[in-house]
Amino acid sequence: MSDKDDIETPVVTEAAPILEDENCEPAKNSGSLDLSAKPESKSEPVVSTRKRPEFKHSSDLETSEVLPVQASEAAGKEAVSKDVPQTGWGYWGSWGKSLLSSASATVATVGQGISNVIERAETSLGIPSPSDISTEVQYAAGETNAKESENSSPVSGPFGVFSTISTAVQSTGKSVISGGLDALEFIGKKTMDVIAEGDPGFKRTKGLMNRTSTLSQVLREVKEKEELWTSNEVTIETDKKTHYGLLFDEFQGLSHLEALEMLSRESEIKVKSILNSLSGEELETLKLELEQLKEAFSLAEFCEEEEEETKGDEDFTKEITELFSQLHVSSKPEKLARARNTAYEWISTSLAKPLEKKEEGEKQLEAEEAEQISNSSIEDIHAFAIRSLAELTACSIELFHKIAALVLHGRKQEVSAIERSRALSQMTVLLCKELSSLSKEFTTCLTTAGASNSASYIQDAFQLLLPVLEISLIENKTELPEA
Amino acid sequence: MEAIWLYQFRLIVIGDSTVGKSCLIRRFTEGRFAQVSDPTVGVDFFSRLVEIEPGKRIKLQIWDTAGQERFRSITRAYYRNSVGGLLLFDITNRRSFQNVHEWLEETKVHVQPYQIVFVLVGHKCDLDTQRQVTRHEAEKLAAAYGMKYIETSARDAINVEKAFTDLTRDIYELVKRGDITIQEGWEGVKSGFVPNVVHSSEEVVKSERRCLC
C-alpha cells in the first residue's frame, strides 16, 4: 500500500491548478451547491431548457472522490486491465457488444487486417486490453458476420447506444488507462444513462439531447477531458492531432453548437409561452401545425439506406446547394462544400486506399503509389481522417447554426416552416451519408467511432432546429393573417 | 504544446455594421486581410493563443458578432459570457462613432451581473485622408467610459496585435488581482492546464516499479 502513497502525490498536483483557482473565488458555496444538485439532476428526465450547469466541478468532484483508488489505477495499463473488471467490466461488456457488432462489418471487409483494426481501434478508443477485445471481436465477428454482410455500413448502425457511449469512451479512453477510475466512472455514468433509457436498439439519436446536459456541454466535458489528458501526456504531442473532440473544437464546432443551442432554447421558451397564452380552437390549430413540423423532423431516415457509390464532388455540392436553396436563407454552404472536397481530393491524391487489399477493383492502385504510401504515413492518414471528420462535422454544425440565425432573423421569405423542415431533414440525411462515405474511404485505418459521432452530432444539431422552426411558423402566422 | 494555456478569455467584438470587425479578427487570427467578406450572420468564432509573458499563454476565444440590426437580439445574448470586448467604430464613418454610446448602453443592460473590460477601437486608420473622427475626440470618449483607445488597420496590419494583447494583459491583471474570478456558469474566464506540475502516467508507472524493487 505504500506504493499508492507515493503515486498519489503527482495525481493530486495534477488537479491542483484548477482547485487552486476555485478556492480563490469568494462565492465558493454556490459551487458546492451545484455539486450536490448535480447527481440528482442526472436522473431527472428531459429538462432541455434548464440552465446549463458548469461541468468543471463535476469532473473535479469525480477526481477528488476517487482519488485514493485512482492512484492505484493510474499506476499503469497492467493495473487497469486487471482492476477494471471488478469495478466496471459490466459497462465495458455491454458497450463492447454493440461496438463489436458494428465493428464487425469493418472486420469482415478488412479480413486479414483484423489485428490492425483492433490495434487501431484500441488506440483510438482506449480499450484496455487488446487481447481480451480481440477474442471478443472474433466471437462477435463470427456471430454477426452472417447477418451483417459487407454492404452494411460500419457507421450506419451504431447511432444509438454505441455512439453515445463511444463519445465518452473515445475521448476518455486514454484517461481510463492513465487517469483511472474517474474516467471509468464518467463512462459508467454515460453508459448507465443510456442503458436506463432501456432502448439499445433505437436508431435515432435522442440519446445525447434528451438528458439533462446539453449536447455541447457533453462535448465540452469530453473535450476538457481530452485536453487534460493531452496536457498530461506532454511527451506524446502528436496524438493531439488525432483527438476528435479537440479538433472539433478547433474548427469551432463546439462554439457553433453552443450558439445553436442558445437559439434553440430561446425559441423553445417562446413557443411554450405562446402555447400557454392560447386557448380553444386557436390552440388546437396551432398544435396541429406544430405536430406536422415535428413529423418533418422525424422523417429523416438516417440509416439503413441502400449503399450508394461515392458521389463526385459536383454531385455533393450540387445536392447540398439545391437543398440549401430550398431553405430560402441568404447564405451558401460554400465552406462545407470546400471542406468536403478538400477531404476527397486528399484521399484521391495521397491515399487511394493503400492498405486495403480488397477484391473489389474500385479505385485500382498504382504499384508505385502503393510504395509511396509506406507504413510511416499510416499515422498521417489516421490523423487526416479524424481531422477531416471533425472539420466536416464542425462545418455542418456551423451551417445549422447559421440557418437557425437566418430563419429567426433573416428577411421574410416565401417559404413555410414545413418546407424548410423537410429540406433540413433531407440535408441531415445527406450530411450523415457524406460523413459515412468519407469515413469509409478511411476505413482501413479508422475505427468507426469518428463517423458515428459525427453523424449523431449532426442529427442532434438538426433536432435543435425544431423549436427554431416552430417559432418561425408561429411568427409567420401572426405576420401574415390574410395569407 | 499549443494546447497548454493558463486561462481562456472569451472576448466579444461589437460595433456597427461594416466597421470591419470580421476583418480585424481575421487579421489577428489568420494573419491575412480579406478584402471582400459577406456580412456576418449572427455570430462567428475564432480563437488564438497569446503569450502575455514568457511561457504564459492565454487562449482567446473571440466572438465575432453581426453588426446588422436584425441580429441584435442574438448578439445581445452573448455579452453575458464575455470577459472582454473590442468596441469598434470606423474612423471614416462618423455615424459609427456616434453609435458607440448606444453600444455601451446596450452592453451595460445585458451583461449583468458581470462586466466586460472594453477597449475602444478606431478602425480603418489607414484611410486617414477620409477621417471623420479625430483621435482627440475618440480618446475623450474612451476616457469618459474608462476605456483605452487604440487605432487600428486590418489592411495595413497596424496595431491589430496590440489591440488584442493589451486588452488580454489588462484582463489578466484583473484576474491575477482577483477583481475578476472564475465563476460557475460563466464562460468569460476559464482556467487552463499548467504543464509543469503535471506528471505523465509513464513517470507514475516508473516510480511504482522502483518501489516494487
Curated annotation (Swiss-Prot), chain B:
Kindly list the residues that the UniProt entry marks as S-geranylgeranyl cysteine lipid attachment points: C211, C213
Q: Which Pfam families match?
A: Ras (PF00071)
Q: What class of enzyme is it?
A: hydrolase
Regulation of activity is described as: Regulated by guanine nucleotide exchange factors (GEFs) including C9orf72-SMCR8 complex, which promote the exchange of bound GDP for free GTP. Regulated by GTPase activating proteins (GAPs) which increase the GTP hydrolysis activity. Inhibited by GDP dissociation inhibitors (GDIs).
Which GO cellular component terms, listed alphabetically, does the Swiss-Prot or TrEMBL entry include?
cytoplasmic vesicle membrane; Golgi apparatus; neuron projection; plasma membrane
Q: Which residues bind Mg(2+)?
A: S22, T40, D64
Residue positions where Cysteine methyl ester is found in the record = C213
**NCBIfam families linked to this entry:** small_GTP
Protein name, as recorded: Ras-related protein Rab-39B
Q: Which organism is it from?
A: Bos taurus (Bovine)
List the top taxonomic levels of the source: Eukaryota, Metazoa, Chordata, Craniata, Vertebrata
